[in-house]
A protein has these predicted regions:
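Internal mixed-charge
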Residues: 36-122
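Conserved short "hinge" loops at termini or chain/domain junctions
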Residues: 1-66, 121-153
């Protein structure tokens, strides 16, 4: 299930849609690309949400407009980007590079909003595991050995 629609993307990036306000085979990008990108961004949302214990795809009416708006906005940014405009225009960026950037942004967006999303979905978000690095110290046991046995952990 995709969040957002090609019509929603066209509403945010009307310059790149046809005269009827739709993407088709003659627009850049084509409708098929917009549809694929919506599915990919939606999958990114689902993966990020499921990492917090949220059942996906989300079907709760109170949340769907927010997820659709996010997907539409990210795909509209891609539409502008492939046309050399918008936030991806600063340096040449390919569609696959844009998707990687959007993937990172999606994870951050879900992390920022998971408290409210979890409350509306009646889910207690799980805490993601954070790796812990422990740095030890060494104490010299004697001043004369040289085979490495002079240190204890």
């Amino acid at each position: 299930m995709s969040y957002g629609t090609a019509a929603g993307v066209a509403a945010l990036a009307p310059r790149y849609a046809n005269a009827a306000g739709r993407f088709d085979e003659n627009t850049t990008p084509k409708l098929a690309h917009v549809t694929d990108w919506l599915a990919q961004v939606s999958a990114m949302l689902d993966v990020a949400l499921s990492g917090y214990g949220v059942e996906t795809p989300v079907t709760v009416a109170a949340i769907l407009p927010m997820l659709a708006g996010y997907a539409n906005a990210q795909v509209a940014a891609m539409v502008r980007g492939v046309n050399g405009q918008g936030r991806f225009a600063e340096k040449p960026t390919t569609a696959d590079e844009m998707l990687l950037i959007i993937g990172d942004a999606t994870a951050a967006w879900v992390t920022k909003n998971i408290g409210g999303l979890g409350a509306l979905l009646d889910v207690t978000p799980v805490t993601l595991a954070t790796p812990t690095v422990t740095i030890g110290s060494f104490t010299r046991r004697d001043g004369y050995s040289s085979d490495g046995s002079e240190y204890t952990a």
